[in-house]
Amino acid sequence: MIAAVWFGLSQVDWMKFLNIEQTTQNTEEKIGDLFWKMLKSSETEIISDSIVAPVDSMLTRICTANQIDRAKVKLHLLRKGEINAFALPNNHLVIYSGLIAACENEAELCGVIGHELAHIEKNHVMNKLIKEVGLSVLISMSTGNGNAETIKAAIKQLSSSAYDRKLETEADLTAVDYLEKAGIDPEPFANFLYRLADETKNLPSQIYWISTHPESKERAEKIIERIKDRDLPKTSAKDSLRFEGLKKSINKVLS
């Protein structure tokens, strides 16, 4: 009798029965916008077209080449010297001006964009929050019952703490695939990781993107292994010229 009951229960689609999937989606939409509103209230968003337009163009290029709906991704550039970028729920992609300044070419920045986009597309963001904060707490936040400190703590989980190694590797290698399909050389992304891993020794508190994405040298080596023997695309003169203009504008913002 008990065995029959357990068998019957095992045949139930509990995700559908309890409407958990729909609840999670609704919660993600609400808390994503809530998180961004909270973050924006304490930071300065960059709206200069000389900065936003080229970064938006890079994101659009990657999305278009990989059949990702560009319209759903909400790009935000913040005036902060730290080298950081992260994704928030509901497809918010946040990039600090300090990270753009740290990139030596467009392909490096595209690698970071691809990495964070992979976290969004693979649903890493909500999975991390549910694991570390809990779905019930997130639902409470989405219904207006979360206090400011709780919300700030959740944002910090995404902006300054690492995903596990498996998810970071998946995001890196997915970014490599995104870049190749977009006609962008992935090798500079590996070079970016190598370089910042070395610089972390001197400026650990400023390089949040590396400190929250550990094992940078190992990650770079996996990228190089992934792309070896492949015929990689080369950066065009047009891309180089556009990036030079972007860096000049960013340096003015940071000065």
Task: Put a short name on every predicted segment.
Residues 1-255:
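A Zn2+-metalloprotease active-site environment signal
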